[in-house]
Amino acid sequence: MGSVSYTAMTPLSFLERSARVWPGKVAVIYGRRRLTYSEFAAEVEQAARALRASGVQPGDRVAYLMPNLPELLIAHFAVPLAGGVLVAINTRLTAHEVAQILRHSGARIVVADASLLPTAMTAAGGLDAVTRLVVVADTEASSARAEQAVGPAAEPRLVSYREFLAGQAGDPLPWSVPDELDPIAINYTSGTTGLPKGVIYTHRGAYLNSLAQIIHSRHDENSVYLWTLPMFHCNGWCAPWAVTAIGGTHVCLREVRGEAIWQQLREHGVTHLNAAPTVVSAILTASQAGPLTRPVTVTTAGAPPSPTTIAEMERTGFKVVHVYGLTETYGPFTVCQPQPQWAGLPADQRAALQARQGVGMIQTGGLRVVDSAMADVPADGETMGEIAMRGNTVMAGYYLDPEATAAAFRGGWFHSGDLGVMHPDGYIELRDRAKDIVISGGENISTIEVEQALMSHPCVFEAAVIGVPDDKWGERPKAFVVLRPGTSTTVKDLAAHVRTRIAGYKTPRDIDITVKLPKTSTGKIQKYVLREKERSSHAHQVQG
């Protein structure tokens, strides 16, 4: 293919263009700190030169362990500009878990926030592959954190971010790549079923998914995007690249709390944010919550939002975009595309339609619900099968794991492990993870369906349902519920309410009203933690 009619796709071109088109426009806001697009590009080039000067060669992995700071946003461009591959690590992991990722990825350089330096140092302690530890002092955080960053250290590989960048000047770097299928990032899965797997993203996939985020989340040059979604989670659904591509403004946020989010919403005129439903719930129940003076588009994924949550968001002034995907699909892969006729429906009916996972996004290549023989299930909204995907934004594979890659890609499709149905209108609806489905007396019970029935109760803030052993039925559903602040109800009342929504055999016999539910850093409820507790409790009862 001739070079005149072909250019390798890379998100690097987004910042190169925006720095030319909007050089004086504010690109990044963090506390008192501001970066124009021209300054943003200059800091990216400086960091890329520092990485190269530290020995980063094409394809080398560079790990970042930090919250949503400007430095992590810069890294999404600087690391690939230097020819490296970005490995953004979950900040909630233990040193042992971080070490597993550093060891598997073979990261040469680790860049860490000062507050996470002890974790980074412990994790890198026995790894000779790590040649440099760079610590970032967050000047907008507490002075203690900043002082911690610049104090003396026995670790010879340690250097401050300021020292790391010092004196890095030279000729302009090329904002291009030789091959669009080269890796741009490796994102590690949660590892709830074993060791985390490294999911490879390419320049091409990141480029196309970024354009899809612009289209489906309705971004333009007036977008003010609040960073409530961790950048370490699927590279923030490619929003570092998407918002930059369209010339929007990034508002960085160190800690995701309801009050802090409302402050940013009002202070900076935020127009967009991405969040899991649990984060959305925290926003809605924050003490500063109130009607918005301008619409804010919330793109949400994770656990399917309940119709009750969607209706409440709309009343507050949030415009909901519901998407679905996995780490292996660069984050969002489907969108619940609104239809004009939905607007005239009652709120509860419209919300129920919007809670579905929808149709393939514009960049995708295929979306199916299949049975064990890879045949499409009937589009009847009832027959469950596994959701399978293929196309431009499915991962290149699992890093250094050809067997897991082959298993995930069997039959020429990516197997999600999620169970769902296909509706007659072509929209899919997630019913459960394959491991979360409850099989009671031979009947499949969708825990999501039970959770949504519970969430429709006015006192219920959050709900999680798992399967627990039952001598008669094999399994039965058990619910864990967090009530809304200032409300009260009884288990009997909750069960009676659920029976008005779903069949009696699906209604949990056991409902625990609790203070909080275990969650991941992105706000997803960790059902495996609940299952482990129940398993331990059941084993103790049997032994006792």
Feature map (PLM): residue ranges:
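Adenylate-forming
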Residues: P67, A112-M121, L229, V256-A260, ...
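Conserved AMP-binding/adenylate-forming
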Residues: G248, R266, P305-V323, T327-I428, ...
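Conserved pre-ATP/AMP-binding loop-to-beta segment of ANL
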Residues: P23, V135, A154-V159, A166-Y188, ...
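Conserved AMP-binding/adenylate-forming core of the ANL superfamily
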Residues: T7, L12, E16, G24-L69, ...
